[in-house]
Amino acid sequence: NDFFAAFHIGLFALVATLFIGITGVVVVKLRELKVKSIPEYYEIRFGKNVRILGAILLVIGGILNMGLFLKVGAIFVQGILSSTYGISWVDESESILSIIMTILLVMVLLYTILGGMISVIITDYIQFVVLSIGLILSVLFSVHTLGWFNIFNQLEILASNPKLVYDPFQSRGGFYVSWQLVLGFVSAIIWPTAITRALSLKSPETVKKQYLWSSISFLIRFMIPCFLGICAFIYFNGKVVGGDTLMMMPMYLVEILPVGVLGIMVAAMLAAFMSTHDSYLLCWSTI
């Protein structure tokens, strides 16, 4: 519902991560202590009981977060299959969604358990390359199909209030926007998928460089999916397809992308899915 106003999430992630990269606040001190996780620091600072409590809270948050990503990834695959092959039962059955989720999770579990850290590093790099190609092609085809200026014009027509399209303070309010900045900062410091990488690097200076470069990727990974979602909304004239907004983007991609490019994009999204979950499995194993 926020359209281009939702870009503020990526912008704040950029600002927060860039600030950490420049100053080294918190993360450099943690690296100097040579801890491998936030709960390990809790034990040094507060004692074993606090470490256990902190680990439990992080594990609960990780399970809930991973479950959300798992379902969204399966919905994307479900939407692609339903739109491409016209299989109605794929679109309607919740049990099929569970089967897709299980298959995807088993795939990730197998190569993560068998390959360990090396498999995660190598596959994450390959998946990043494939994902970058897929997203760039999807953006180019979206602009070609809809027209650059037409995207903005149509969005202002379809939106109930044109002011809400660009201004997050209008669409969400100042408190929510401020909270997003705090959330971006805290996530970059204590969330295991971010901090585990930092604490595994060879020196505090390398940690700062990692955050500096990561700030750019944080911005891009929020903006491009949001942009594709906006294009899907415009393509279907603001009508929710199948009663589920999560189905709009995969159905939109099936409509506008040629067969070969669609295959690259599906591979890219599966790569993003697998990259997320193998990192989650590895990072939460340190907790």
Predicted regions and their residues:
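Membrane-embedded alpha-helical core segments of multi-pass
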Residues: 17-23, 34-35, 111-115, 130-141, ...
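Juxtamembrane loop-helix boundary motifs flanking transmembrane segments in multi-pass membrane proteins
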Residues: 30-38, 45-52, 109, 117, ...
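Loop-to-helix junctions at membrane interfaces in multi-pass transport proteins
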Residues: 1-9, 43, 84-98, 129-263
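A generic alpha-helix surface/boundary motif
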Residues: 24, 36, 71, 75, ...
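Re-entrant/interfacial helical elements at transmembrane boundaries that shape
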Residues: 280-287
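Helix-loop-helix module between adjacent transmembrane segments
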Residues: 6-112, 180-184, 270-279
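Hydrophobic residues within alpha-helical transmembrane segments
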Residues: 14, 56, 103-106, 125-129, ...
